[in-house]
Regions:
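Conserved metal-phosphate-binding beta-hairpin within the catalytic cores
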Residues: 63
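Short Pro-Cys-Gly-centered "Cys-loop" motif that presents a nucleophilic cysteine in a tight turn
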Residues: 1-58, 66-222
């Protein structure tokens, strides 16, 4: 039976997940992590994607991207393929590095992009790798809240814009929004980004305006 085709269209917004084959690690040291981040940036730039967030863990990674052209499959094939070749060459391995195809969830709702961004930021905490999301170095979260310089291909404004317009800086309000998710995670919430904490609710750290939306054929404000 053939594989179901990916849903691709101009302006689509995705939460993409790629996992190591048989749950094996795909980043064994800092050099691997840094090289994978660089590869993500190269593919984002090459295919004119808009990347709002990413997080790399030992055996998988997450990215959220908008694709002004219907080219997610092409870009992910280059990203995963080039990294797998380098990984196998570096460690003298053969065979698959990643487990089957990547996962791609369409982000359809306005508030879902913020929920996905928070979910991605909290992944290292959820995995027990650190106690707070800003302590994990292989994530875009530190750049989004102003602790690191963002790379030119990272669209942090797409997550910060909904929190702008008040006396408190947008990065501070976005950090508080993620903190809400961290509190829920520690309290045993079933998922910090599954809708338990919808932007605009909880402890008052939600956005003042609606996040940017992505329409077919372009990436425009909605």
């Amino acid at each position: 039976m053939g594989r179901n085709p990916r849903i691709q269209f101009a302006g689509a917004l995705y939460h993409v997940t790629t996992r190591g084959n048989a749950k094996q690690r795909v980043c064994l040291d800092d050099w691997d992590f840094a090289w994978l981040v660089a590869q993500i940036g190269e593919v984002v730039t090459r295919y004119s994607w808009v990347c709002q967030s990413y997080c790399l863990l030992g055996n998988h990674f997450h990215v959220s991207v908008a694709t002004p052209e219907p080219n997610l499959a092409k870009g992910m094939r280059i990203l995963n393929g080039s990294y797998a070749q380098r990984f196998n060459r570096r460690y003298g391995r053969v065979g698959h590095v990643f487990q089957g195809r990547y996962g791609a969830e369409l982000i359809r709702r306005h508030e879902h992009l913020l929920e996905v961004g928070r979910y991605i930021a909290l992944n290292p905490v959820r995995a027990g790798l650190c106690s707070r999301p800003e302590l994990w170095p292989w994530s875009s979260y530190r750049a989004t809240i102003g602790l690191d310089e963002p790379p030119p291909w990272l669209a942090i404004d797409d997550l910060l814009a909904p929190f702008s317009g008040g006396p408190t800086p947008a990065a501070v309000r976005y950090r508080a929004f993620v903190e809400d998710g961290l509190h829920a995670l520690r309290a045993g919430s079933r998922s910090a980004g599954s809708g338990d904490l919808v932007p605009g609710h909880g402890r008052g750290h939600g956005p003042r305006t609606r996040p940017r939306t992505w329409s077919a054929g372009s990436a425009t404000s909605g």
